[in-house]
Amino acid sequence: MQTMYLALGIFLLTYVLMLTLQKYRPTIALSSALIFIVLGLCGVFDFRPLDALAAVDYNVLLMIAGTMGLVTLFIDSRMPAYLAEQLIVRVPNVKWAVTVLALFAGVISAFVDNVATVLMVAPVGLAISRKLKISPVPVLIAIAVSSNLQGAATMVGDTTSMLLGSYAGMNFLDFFWMQGRPGIFWGVELGALASLVALLVIFRKYTEKVAAAVETQVSDYVPSALMIGTVALLIVASFLPEPSDPTLKAIYDLRSGLVCVGLCLIGIVRDCIRKHSGGTFLRVLKDLDKDTLLLLFGLFIVIEGIRVAGVIDAAADLFYNISGDDPFLLYTLIVFASVVLSAFIDNIPYVATMLPVVEGIAALMNGGAGLPPYVFYFGLLTGATLGGNLTPIGASANIAAIGILRKNGETVRLRDFLRIGVPFTLSAVLAGYIYIWLVWGI
């Protein structure tokens, strides 16, 4: 029991430090991981260095790294800005222009990191705002919250989706259709439809005509082909049978990550040869979110450390006792607790921590006989992903959008964000909450 409290204390201190010293989150997570390893070597925990290395989900890290590299090439090709402009010239007024731009950001975000999506689409939103002489603040906020929503739609849309997919043994297609039922993708899309109505109401007074033209020229179509190829190969990888040979099994477990990294390397090498320069490789390396990769590496070890110490089981018991073996009450608690918590804390460490807790709770349900955990997994992902839209600091995409606005001399007040974030989040969460329970909970 004392070792469990020690592990819990280290974990809570780690979390508090990551919240207060966000710039140093990777260092804090790695330091905490090292503490668990040292305590394991000292015999305090049954936790060896090999256990720590085995706890790291290398498939997730490879997927994140490869996807980020592809996104850099995709942005450089100017294809996202070109597509956005093509959409804008076909709408009747500013209300629809902003809404369509937000929806477009959502579609892109289903396959591209949320922050990268904001960086892609924000310049188009700024240009439209300048032409029409309207404030870009609500436009970029709408883009940010929409990209956060759709990040949960597919396995490659966001880090939290990658974490869920890998932890639950889901493949790319399982997000669309799994075990004879519609997957979480359709719940996210229902949430998108509900939030579309919210956006149209919010921007109902923006009735000015749009006088825009397609000015962007695509410089390279190969990155777009690589993005499409990534999705296609992930689908193919979903159908590959699991091998029995241990070596092949290890490669099989990394298949999604290897697809993303492999196509990224093809794009980099091809661009370096085409330009007779290594600049593309250096730019991709510079744009790689090394902080997130190091943060996750450390967190995987920390979470395994607290699992070995019994903290995960104790947390599962606590949730189970609160819900009283009522699956619907537990599902509701997970969804809305995740919404509230993710409004103030980063959803990546939250989801990474809660996945094993949710699995443990599901095993205790039904009088100890256990229940399939998927309804609780999907509730966790929905609440954690959308909860970030409640506040300006709840998601990295929001912070990125606000940073762009400030660089352009705009002031973003809390009420400006809440005016869009709250109705958007509530409408999307409720739609997804009802859908997931009707499809997976009954």
Feature-to-residue mapping (PLM):
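Hydrophobic transmembrane alpha-helices of multi-pass small-molecule transporters
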Residues: 1-76, 82, 180-317, 412, ...
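Transmembrane alpha-helix interface/packing and boundary motifs in multi-pass membrane proteins
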Residues: 16-23, 104-113, 144-156, 336-350, ...
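Residues that define the loop-to-transmembrane-helix transition and helix capping
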Residues: 26, 59, 95-96, 137, ...
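Alpha-helical transmembrane segments of multi-pass membrane proteins, especially transporters
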Residues: 29-32, 36, 68, 98-105, ...
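Membrane-embedded alpha-helical segments and adjacent helix-loop junctions characteristic
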Residues: 50-137, 292-367
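Re-entrant/interfacial helical elements at transmembrane boundaries that shape
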Residues: 83, 116-127, 140-141, 154-170, ...
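Membrane-core helix-loop-helix motifs of multi-pass transport proteins
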Residues: 128-224, 368, 372, 399-434
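C-terminal transmembrane helix pair
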Residues: 177-187, 298, 329-442
